[in-house]
Every structure is written in structure tokens, then in C-alpha cells.
Amino acid sequence: MVQFYSPKKRPAKKQVKNLAVTANALDANGQGIAHAEGKTIFVKGLLPQETARIRLTEEKRQFAKGEVITRLTTNPERVTPPCQYYQHCGGCQQQHVPIDWQRTTKAEVLSHLIKRETNVVISAQPVIAGAEYGYRRRARLGLRYHPKKGLVMGFRQALSNDLVMVTQCPVLKPQLNVLLLPLWQCLKQLSVVRDLGHVELVLADNGPLVILRHLSPLSEGDKQLLDDFSHHAQVMIYLAGDNGEIAQLTTIEKEPFYQIEGLKLHFAPTDFIQVNDEINHKMVAQAIAWLDLSPNDRVLDLFCGMGNFTLPMAKRVDKVVGVEGVPALVAMAKKNAELNQLDNVQFWHADLSADFSAMPWAQEGFNKVLLDPARAGAAQVMSHIVTLSAEKIVYVSCNPTTLARDSKILLDSGYQLTQLRMLDMFPQTGHLESMALFIRK
């Protein structure tokens, strides 16, 4: 029997939908919020009271995302972005949005989330804010060699792994911004230019440092080029090879540090420090004020890092215990306590996502608590915090979703959320950081 094959008809290619919308609000990422065809539509780059013809880039049952084809009307408050790479580089999302709009929107989003998850109505204002540009004291730039373009040094494009070559960045501290072009000119001369991974720039209080990740050994000529650059630009240079170790290249023997609350905190080149030093100062001061520290207090600082909160608190109380999961940060915290002649503080290494109940510090009593967890939050330590029955708890958060989740545990255990603040740690971006004060009823 002869069988005939009839190919199935290919489904018609789904047409991209274009429509005209008017935004009436902003989300935390600076996207305009519009409504059409029974859906909420998030439109990149559209401000409230602006109308545009848009193209839908993603469509779900209850919402859609769109991009502007043509803006038909312009809000007079629209800001001209100062960065030539804006909308190509993925680092910033809100340079077209007035800074007060950015802050108000983020604060409202935070308050709305807390209300939705906990039923607590509370304002996240006044916002803890600082400079809108020139604030970033740490940045990592990718390095990639192209046969035609040569060395590209820059940040990732939005929704892409491609790099956008940058020779200036207005959110960087000026002392770092001026290094971009001469640093690139130096790196592109290296013999291992095809085997570079990334470069980090950090501004310590005693000068800038550069950490270069290289995938092949540097020649003596390469090291000389870098050493010449370090002396000309007055920067400390560190090399990160395949062995995972960080080695200081330059003869400028200075250990990086920053100062806070009259203390000098040293850190290793790859140690975590808050990117925005102005907001960090204000955040630490706010936490100390909220805890209302006195000489008789015993304070527990969880996820303490190298002592950013711990050591300033130790100046004011009877005893502070800091607990951290990264051994290198614990070692640096102990060193900083000794250098600052603080003998009423102890630091412990512990995995705070595991059972730590048998550790000596977990047997102690504390009347005040501060915690500053990573994005995953502090779910595993909340039950221990509750058993302490501390008078006051300050929770510093880089993820409002996990803050809301962990807040419910405290609220259900007899605590009251009395203060909430949005920390504008990363202006021009969608990042939202916050801090909250809980008081035992």
C-alpha cells in the first residue's frame, strides 16, 4: 500500500501586538505602569502621564511587558540621562526618572509589600538618601577580547551577556571614574590580554585599589606595565590568578580601610563592604539610634561581616557578640576589634542556615539584636531570636520579600513593627534596601 504524507500546516507566526497606552504610575524598576485590554502593562522607559505606542515583549494572563516604539507625549519632569551608555548598559534603569520619584516609588512599594504580607500599615519614609550620582565605591567590570575590537572593558547589557564598553560611569565615585580610561589603555597592552576575566575597582579611605582576575600567568613585562600604572595613578594593584589567592603586585604597601563612627575598619580587597559609603554611615547611625544603646546592653549582631555594625555598637554597650558565616570576615572582624582597642566584643564563625544551638554564643542572653542577612533572609535564625525575648530588634535587609516573610515570625511572637525605612543605597537602579525596627510589646 502506498502511503501519502501530508505535512502538517505550520502554526501561524504569532503577531507582535502594538498598541497605544498612557502610564499612570511607576514601579520600583522605573517602568511605567499602564492598563489596556484588561491587563496591567509594564513599559520600560515610560513615565507617568506619558503616552506611547508600544510593542508587547511578553504577555501573560494578567499582565504584560512592553517597550516604547514612539513616545507620543513627554512628561516635562523627564530627566535627560547624564550617561552616554544609558539604555545600552544594564547597570542603571532609572536615569530618566527624577530622583525624588525614584525614592518615593521605592518607599511606597516597600510599604505596600509589608502591608500585603503582614497587614501592618506603616510608612517607609523619610527615605535614607544621599548623592544620586558619584556614590559607588566598588564595581566589577567584565573583560573580553574580540579579534576586531580588541579588549572590551565594561558592564553587561540588559538581558544579555554581551559587554558594553565604558570609559566613564557617573554612578562611580569620581576617584574611580577617572581610572576607567587609563586602566583600559594599560590592560589592552598586556601580553595575556586574551586571558583576562574581570577587573574590580574599590575606593578605600586611603586610596583606590584594582583587583585584576587573569586566567594565564602574567609576564614580567605585564607586571611592569601594571606597576607603572599603579604609581602613575596612585592605586594599589592586586592580582587574582587561577590558584584562588590574591597577591599584591605593587610596592605601595597600604592595607585598605574605611572609617565609620570614629573607627578604622581594615578589609581585604575581596571582602564585602557596603557599596555606598554615605548611606552606610547613615544606616549605622540609624540602627544605633533605634536600638537606643546604653552601657548595660548586651547586643547580638547576626551576619556581622567584618564588624560594620558590631564595632560601632561596642563603643556604647557592655558586650557585643558578632556571628558570621565567612571565616575570612570573622578573622578580619577580630583584627579590627584589636586595632580599635575594643575588648568587649567577641566574634564567632557559624553557619546561620544550620543548627547552631550548641555553640557557646547561642547559650548567652541578649537584650538587643541586629541582623543584616543576605538576600535569602534569616528564616533559620528567627526562632532563636524569638527565644531571646530581646527588647528591640533591628533588621537590615537587601531583599524586601524576605524581610516581609521574616517579619511575620516576629509579629506573631509578640513584636510590633514600629519603624521602617527605605535605604536608597543604589540610586538610578531598581535595587531596594531597607531597615526595620521591632519592639517587644
UniProtKB/Swiss-Prot annotation:
Domain TRAM positions: 8-70
Entry binding sites for S-adenosyl-L-methionine: 274, 303, 308, 324, 351, 372
SUPFAM superfamilies associated with the record: Nucleic acid-binding proteins (SSF50249), S-adenosyl-L-methionine-dependent methyltransferases (SSF53335)
Substrates-to-products reaction catalysed: uridine(1939) in 23S rRNA + S-adenosyl-L-methionine = 5-methyluridine(1939) in 23S rRNA + S-adenosyl-L-homocysteine + H(+)
UniProt: [4Fe-4S] cluster binding residues: 83, 89, 92, 169
EC number: 2.1.1.190
GO BP terms in the entry: rRNA base methylation
Family per record: Belongs to the class I-like SAM-binding methyltransferase superfamily. RNA M5U methyltransferase family. RlmD subfamily.
Job description of the protein: Catalyzes the formation of 5-methyl-uridine at position 1939 (m5U1939) in 23S rRNA.
Protein name listed in UniProt: 23S rRNA (uracil(1939)-C(5))-methyltransferase RlmD
Species annotation: Proteus mirabilis (strain HI4320)
